Amino acid sequence: MTSVMIVLQAIVPQHWLSRAIGKLAGLSKPIWLKNALVGAFMHRYDIDLSVAECDDATAFPDFNAFFTRALRADARPLAAADWCHPADGVLSQRGDIEAASLIQAKGRRYRVDELLAGSVEEAHRYRNGCFATTYLSPRDYHRVHMPISGRLVKTRYVPGDLFSVNAATVQRVEGLLARNERLVCFFETDHGGVVVVLVGAMIVAGIATVWGGRELPGASAIRESVWSAEEAPSFEKGEEMGRFFLGSTVVLVTEAADLNWCDAPGDAVEVRAALSG
């Protein structure tokens, strides 16, 4: 059955479907439809609004506002560790970068330069570094926060597929995280270069950043933005940097090689909690 679902994902019009879902999720009227969508989603995924800034399911202007809801200020305290988790979810993989490649799933690897959609020379900087991959399920908080303090120097929006990024698909689709549409964000930090990659997926209706707004799926070419040292926005560890409009994955790539992991692959993790002690 899993193989059938993957074949279906490959043949459906992924970007059209994602854009259509995005339009539906952005509807504020009729109110009964908006509330029905939110209510059905809450029931299906057992959503807990007690930690949200707004705990009234009917108060959100549209489904997107509900899905990208903010948490209460005290819901995710910031860890004292040097590195914190960038998102709520499951730590699907983490470890050292070996032979310029990362682990996607057991028996499957993909190259750093493929993930970044850049040159081998650009990826060479991270050859001795570390990586961590966090899968965000539909029930998770879908804002992404800085794993460490840093200065944004470049972003690269990469068009691609929109396969689901659940465990079954990641296990079976070769190079999935380097094939899906994604936003690659490069930062300079006190611990060297850091890349935060926001990976799109089936029915993900867009990726947004706090500095550039929303990127809709279906771009026809790579789009790159570069900031000078004087113009580059800076972010503190734990500060919000972006969000997903429906599910996905965050891949963290570091030049630093000395991360002392606090969690094992498969562990549920919370944003702003300690990633490396």
Predicted regions and their residues:
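Contiguous, well-folded functional domains in the mature portion of proteins
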Residues: 1-277
